[in-house]
Amino acid sequence: MNLAQENLNSPNNLGNNATKSPKETVILLNMGGPNSLYEVGVFLKNMFDDPFILTIKNNFMRKMVGKMIVNSRIEKSKKIYEKLGGKSPLTPITFALTERLNELDPSRFYTYAMRYTPPYASMVLQDLALKEVESLVFFSMYPQYSSTTTLSSFNDAFNALKSLETFRPKVRVIERFYASEKLNEIILNTILSTLNNHKSQDFVLIFSVHGLPKSIIDAGDTYQQECEHHVDLLKDLMRQKNIHFKQVLLSYQSKLGPMKWLEPSTEGLIEKHRKSNIIIYPLAFTIDNSETLYELEIQYRLMAARLAIKEYLVCPCLNDSIEFAKFIIELVKNLKDE
C-alpha cells in the first residue's frame, strides 16, 4: 500500500481550509494509531524506531531491537485492534474533535498530525505551506510532559517544518496543561458522570497513566513528577467540592519487556483492592485508544470479573466533548507569544 492509499484511510480536514481564511492554524499532535489492520505494522515499526521511545543511541542497534519487538508483538496487536473494529479509535475521534473546534472557533483553523501513522506532521505541514498561514500552534494532546510523547511529537513537527525552506510561520507551542483547574473540573465531572448514581465513598479511584521504564525517569524525564502533581491537584479539587473516595491512587499501565518500569502497576492495584469497588480514570490520555478501550475496558474488566470485584467502572477520555473543545480554544486564546 502506498502513501496515498494510507492517507485515504486516515480522515483529515485539511481540505476544509480551502473555504476559510484564518491566518493561524492549530495542529493537535498525538501518537496516532492504526487506521486499518494493515497499518498495525506501520504503527509499531515507526514507534519502536523512535529514539525517544527506544533510547538506544546506536541507530543500527535500535533498528535491530525495534524490529525484534515489532515481530514479537504484531500478531498480538492485530488481535487487539480486531476487537476494536479493525482500527484505532484515536484518529476518527481526533478528526471529530477538530471538526467541533472549527465550528466553535472560526477565527482559526484546527487540524491534527500523528507521530506514528498518517496524517504525519510532514504531510500536514506540506499542505499548510501552500496556504496563506502566518502562524502555527503546536498543541500536544498529552496533559503531562514527557520526552517519549510531547518532545517526540514536537521534534518531529519542527523537523518537518524545517525541511520546508519557503514556509516560515510564527510557531507557538502548548506542551502541557494538566495544572489547569478548568481541565480538572472537566475530569472530575467525567468521573462523577461515570459513577452515575453510585456513591463515590464506596469506590477506590485509580488514576491510570501510561507507564515508562524507570531509566527514562532517572535520565531526567519529568513525567512521573507531573503525573503525581496532577493527582495532588485533583485531590485538592475534590476536597474543595467535598467529594470523597475510599482512596485515590495513581498507577502505571502497559508495561513492556523485562526492564524496571514505574510502579505501582494498574493490574497490581486492581488485585490489591479486589474487595472494593473500583473506578478508573485514564489520566494521561485525552483521546480514547487501545490502552483505554482494550486494556482498561476489556482486559482489566475481565480481570476484575475473575477477582469478583462487584463494581468496575472505566471513565471515557475527554475525546470530542464540547467541554474539552472549549477548553482547547481557551488555552489557545490565552497563549502568550514566546
Curated annotation (Swiss-Prot):
Binding residues annotated for Fe cation, in chain numbering: H210, E291
UniProt entry tagged with the keyword Transcription regulation: no
UniProt-annotated location(s): Cytoplasm
GO MF annotation terms: ferrochelatase activity; metal ion binding
UniProtKB keywords: Cytoplasm, Heme biosynthesis, Iron, Lyase, Metal-binding, Porphyrin biosynthesis
Enzyme class: lyase
Pfam families linked to this entry: Ferrochelatase
Example of a GO biological process term: heme biosynthetic process
Keyword ATP-binding: no
PANTHER family for this protein: FERROCHELATASE, FERROCHELATASE, MITOCHONDRIAL
Family annotation (HAMAP family): Ferrochelatase (MF_00323)
Function per UniProt: Catalyzes the ferrous insertion into protoporphyrin IX.
Protein name, entry field: Ferrochelatase
Organism: Helicobacter acinonychis (strain Sheeba)
